[in-house]
């Protein structure tokens, strides 16, 4: 898996001299104690799975970290002008984090809502059973799903009142949906 060039650029600006591609509780342990290929680190940052967060808590006396990340929450505003598969994938990326996540698609397009509803089971079938169960719980419960708004203003109102951690705009004209 390639590391995003923007991440590498930011790391270079911050003076990072070495990057290890690793994840999960095992990455926290490797950073806390060191391994043959990963030197012991002073600090580990960033969000992660519940196992990653638990490992950071357990090893807090061995490696520094800020407060653990909470559940993920996202609202994706989709105006229907782009591929529904993108909306489905983006919402699954957040909803698979755990049952305490929240993930909504907000749209004024009934067609997009129907397309995403049809596509989601196909993509969930490709996920691990655990991640698919998380996504299913989030997307069929009170913390997620598809909100079909009557007007764009109603969509904006819902998004602003919910005030999610992440808000994405999926539109062929994204600037039209950003307040001046």
Label every PLM stretch briefly:
Residues 1-9:
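Conserved small-residue-rich beta-alpha loop and adjacent elements
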Residues 1-2, 18-21, 104, 167-170:
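Short hydrophobic alpha-helical runs that function as membrane-insertion/retention elements
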Residues 13-104:
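Conserved NAD(P)+-binding/catalytic subdomain of aldehyde/semialdehyde dehydrogenases
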Residues 155, 159-160:
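Nonpolar helix-loop interface/hinge motif
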Residues 68-75, 97-148:
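Flexible, acidic loop-helix segments that line cofactor/substrate-binding pockets
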Residues 6, 27, 151-154, 176-177:
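Short acidic active-site motifs
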Residues 3, 79-80, 108, 150, ...:
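Structural motif
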Residues 161-180:
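C-terminal core of ALDH-fold dehydrogenases
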């Amino acid at each position: 898996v390639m590391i995003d060039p923007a991440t590498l650029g930011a790391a270079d600006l911050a003076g990072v001299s070495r990057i290890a591609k690793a994840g999960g509780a095992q990455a926290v342990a490797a950073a806390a104690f060191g391994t043959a290929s990963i030197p012991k680190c002073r600090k580990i940052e960033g969000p992660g799975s519940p196992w990653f967060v638990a490992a950071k808590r357990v090893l807090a006396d061995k490696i520094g970290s800020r407060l653990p990340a909470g559940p993920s929450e996202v609202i994706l505003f989709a105006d229907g002008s782009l591929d529904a598969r993108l909306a489905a994938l983006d919402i699954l990326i957040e909803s698979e984090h755990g049952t305490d996540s929240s993930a909504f698609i907000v749209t004024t397009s009934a067609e997009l809502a129907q397309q995403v509803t049809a596509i989601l089971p196909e993509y969930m079938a490709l996920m691990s059973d655990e991640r698919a169960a998380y996504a299913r719980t989030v997307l069929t419960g009170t913390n997620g799903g598809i909100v079909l708004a009557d007007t764009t203003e109603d969509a904006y109102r819902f998004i602003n009142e919910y005030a999610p951690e992440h808000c994405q705009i999926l539109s062929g004209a994204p600037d039209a949906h950003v307040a001046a």
